[in-house]
Amino acid sequence: MKKNIAIVGAGNGGQAFAGYFALQGHDVRIFDVSEKTIKAINDLGGIEIEGNSSVTGFGKVVLASTKMEEVIKGAELVFLVLPSIYHSKMGEQMAPYLEDGQYVVLNPMAPLGAVEYKNTLDEFGCRADIKIVCTATLLFACRADHVGHVNVGGQKVSYSACTYPSCYNEEAAEVFKSVLPELYFCDDIIRISLDNLNAIVHPGPTILNTGRMESNIPYQYYIDFTPGQGKIAEALDRERMKIGEAFGLNIRDFVDEFKSMYEVEGDTIYDVLRNNSGYKGLMGQNTLNSRYLREDVPYSLVAFQTLAKIAGIEIPTIDAVVTIARNLLKDLDEGRTTKNLGLENVTKEEFIQMCRG
C-alpha cells in the first residue's frame, strides 16, 4: 500500500531512503537545511539509486524543501535520517508541525536517542499523539557520489527496531511490514541502543588509526582493519553484552549480530568486517575530527556509560576509550549522560518500565 513518507535529512542515508521509497511507489518528500542540496534535488526531480540495492533506478521525489512544515505535513511516516548529534535540534524544529497518528522513525537511533528526542518534543510543546520508532542501524551501506546520485555498497537482510515505549511494537510492526520488511521488532530501546554496532567498531579502532591519519596514509576503514583493532573491538563488545545482561537482555555478540544483517563469513570482528564485500572502497578518514569520534563517543559510548551507571556495573574499556577520545578532541560534546537525559535518580526497574510502557 502506498504511503506518504517524509525524509528529514538529505545526506547519504536520507537520499538513499528517498530514492528507495520512491522507487517502491511511495510519495516521498525530503527536508534539508542546505538550500544548495534541496535545489539540486528539485532540479533533478528525484534520486538515482545504483549498486547493491534491492531496487535501482530513478526515484521521483514529490517535493524537496528547506521548510520543515511543507515536508512533514500529512506524512504517515517521518524518517529522521541524520547523525544523532542533530536529532534534538530537529526535534525542536519538528515539534510545532507533528500531527496525530504519525510515526517518527529515528533512523538510526544512536543509544538512548529516543529519550533525548522525546524530552525535546516535550520541552518545545509538542502535543501531537505520535509514536516514536527506533532502528539500530541504516538499511544501507551507501555513499552519495553527488547530490541526487547514491551508490549502495550493501543492503541488510535484517535489522532491529522498536517503539518507545515498546508496548506499541505489535501495532508498528503491522504498519512497517510493507515498507521495510527487513525490520524485526524487539524488546525495547535498551536493546536497540545496545544493537548499535558503530559504538564498537568506530571510536576505539579510530583512535588506533591515529598514526595512519596523521601520516596521511590512505586506507579502507573496514577492509584494512587490523588484528589489534579487532581485539579492542572484541573487548568493547564484551562490555556491551555485559550491559545487556544487567538489564536481563540476551544480546548477541557483534559477529552473530553482523551475520544476521549481512551474508558474510568469519568467526571474529576482524574477519567479518574484512570479508564484507559491501565495505570495499569505503575509505577511512584522514582526521580525528570526524563523526566516528564526534558522534559515536558522546552519543553512543557515553550512553553506554549511562546504561551501565543505571544498572550499577563497571565498563572499564568503554571508560578508557571515552577518556582517550576526550584527550584527543578536547571539545567533544558532553553527550548522553544521566544528567542530560534527566535520568539521574531513575532506578533500573523504573527505567525498564519507562522503556516498555
Enumerate the predicted regions with their spans.
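NAD(P)+-binding Rossmann beta1-loop-alpha1 motif at the extreme N-terminus of oxidoreductases
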Residues: 1-51
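Nucleotide donor/acceptor-binding cores
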Residues: 3-4, 130, 157
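Rossmann-like NAD(P)-binding element
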Residues: 54-93, 97, 105
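Rossmann-like NAD(P)(H) cofactor-binding subdomain of soluble oxidoreductases
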Residues: 84-148
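Internal alpha-helical scaffold of NAD(P)-dependent oxidoreductase catalytic cores
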Residues: 146-219, 223-257
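NAD(P)-dependent Rossmann-like dehydrogenase/reductase catalytic/cofactor-binding core
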Residues: 212, 230-357
